[in-house]
């Protein structure tokens, strides 16, 4: 892991010491080298217990897939943003690349931190570079409003989390996760106090995911962010919330199991259903994809709150699968936007007549998003649905309805973008380049590997 930290840190400064002709290419190559080291270092570390790197850092089966996902998608996002950053000056492009690598370093620190104060610092350090991505390289003037929403919601959840961490230290005299899991000091407090304490812990994570009701910042941020920002935000940054939720839920296992699970799981599955219905009524392609992320992450939260092995396994699988598919959807949306300069679904249609091979990528991505067998999305959703139904059989109708509406809007995305006649007022459509096909293949290839060997994502 020290190699990953060192390479990510050096990559932040690398663009500034290379000539104007080579800095972008070398940065992308360096990103793929980081990916190679991540795959190599983490290959033998899929243990049910922590693999300690040091006293404050370690990886296990929950953090390792998310680290690999982060290092896999960073070079892809850099490749996808080449066209959108071409109009900017070389120094602006260097700043863009450095910002991306700073986010990667913060993600690696967050997913490998064993100590909660270090986890909090790394978790919050993703805020500023993400805000810079949205407000500096966004296309429309509304990006500033999106940035305000993003920072307001995130900071509103950060303060309760900080208070909870400080309180935990005063009680346990340690913030190292393995020692907290084994500690019995928490049992001396009343159930009401512990319930409030746990709410303070998880509110930052459900805002970061986000689940329905705490999601207003996400569609604005996705719509206004540049392509790299949308891909990283949907694929990785939202998973910070799920990861933190899984970690803190294990600390307060007995509290959440006895007192808080019922309202939280009910709220999450209703949120998944409502956002799936909202997606059907969307007219903006990027907003539709953003709302679909809210629905999927609401299901992830429901799976974690069941506190069952099936639920947590399903949540992990769905987070990884959603990370790849949501990034692919934003990449496809950007390919269309670069050719017709609009995200409106009423205008973005008929592309199968112009770019038939692109339609193949659309159908693969959409059917994977809806959970067609044997895709990892199906595995994750089935595990979550099974755990939720086992928790309460009356939740069957709600959670299955959410998946049905999810399938409907996924098919609507494909139908609206590829069917009907191509708009006559749009001309000079550029063919899909080889680099764009490679980008889309790099999203689908890991899913194929997971289909072949799904056990790599299972924690137990």
UniProtKB/Swiss-Prot annotation:
Subcellular location: Mitochondrion membrane
Topological category with respect to the lipid bilayer: Multi-pass membrane protein
Keywords (A to Z) from UniProt: Electron transport, Membrane, Mitochondrion, NAD, Respiratory chain, Translocase, Transmembrane, Transmembrane helix, Transport, Ubiquinone
Gene Ontology terms: cellular component: mitochondrial membrane
Single Gene Ontology MF annotation: NADH dehydrogenase (ubiquinone) activity
Main location: mitochondrion
EC top class named in words: translocase
Record's catalysed reaction(s): a ubiquinone + NADH + 5 H(+)(in) = a ubiquinol + NAD(+) + 4 H(+)(out)
EC number: 7.1.1.2
Membrane-spanning residues: 26-46, 62-82, 100-120, 146-166, 194-214, 225-245, 260-280, 300-320, 353-373, 393-413, 438-458
GO biological process: ATP synthesis coupled electron transport; electron transport coupled proton transport
Keyword Zinc appears in the UniProt entry: no
The protein's role, per its UniProt record: Core subunit of the mitochondrial membrane respiratory chain NADH dehydrogenase (Complex I) that is believed to belong to the minimal assembly required for catalysis. Complex I functions in the transfer of electrons from NADH to the respiratory chain. The immediate electron acceptor for the enzyme is believed to be ubiquinone.
Annotated family: Belongs to the complex I subunit 4 family.
Identification of the protein by name: NADH-ubiquinone oxidoreductase chain 4
Organism: Pisaster ochraceus
